[in-house]
Amino acid sequence: MMRLSSDSELNRAIRDIKRYIREDNSDPIFACEVLAKLRRKYWLFQGEWHNFVNELIAEHYGDNIIEFDGLSFVADKSLAMEYADIFVDEKRVETDRLLSLILGWNIADGCYQTEEVAIKEGDTVIDAGANMGLFSVMAARMGAAKIYAFEPVAASAEKLRRNLELNNITDKVIIEPLGVSECECTVKMFVEGGAAASFVIERGGRCESVRCVSVDEWVGRNGIDRVDFIKADVEGAERLMLKGAQETLKKFAPRLAICTYHLPDDPEVIEGLILKANPAYKIYHTPKKIFAKV
């Protein structure tokens, strides 16, 4: 595999891929198979890869609705990325062949649940970093009574709203157009393709100012009387979210599914913050996530 050392080499690699897809054969399935071969030759920066997947899905699906597992979602590149983290395990990839191929390149660490740490009937759930809402939809299907979906990026929140409507769960899921952090504040977020890219890692492109709140402040302000499950994929702000959720973890001991791949020391820092709040937690590490329960 060749690592690209300059913008010109990267652009040439992208042109090669697009030439195969758009000139040699318009079949998206063939395109995916060619892309798999080319990825062995070229190393693509994450942002460029996401942008390319976005183009491929847009060309194949347009503005259509994708249906799988009895659910419906707006076609979008985030669908592939989120589906891989939320619905797919080694036993089930039940989508059409194009999406399945894309998913196959993105499955790295399984779902936001394990046998030990899972959504239960009647749960109150915080979905921090809801994006377009696949986790919120799944949590509702599994019996959660109320889901609070935190999504500060306007374009993602609009897709989230549409997906809740498509699946008739607007009564169960409340959209909170906020980020989560250590305290109430306004921060700059790097945005790629209308979706959150990073709070803390400068990736170029445009920034959005997003309003953030701490989980503890939000729980107190809104009179939330139970929190049973917290899922957090907040683009590098997971440790800040946990610093602002210490009282919630101490009082309610929610089950936790927290991403740990944005910063090199995430696994140990995030574990430390969980145990600082509530030493009774049992911690389970996977390559990209921490799961915890009392």
Where are these regions (language model features)?
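Phosphate/nucleotide-binding beta-alpha loop and adjacent structural elements of enzyme active sites
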Residues: 1-294
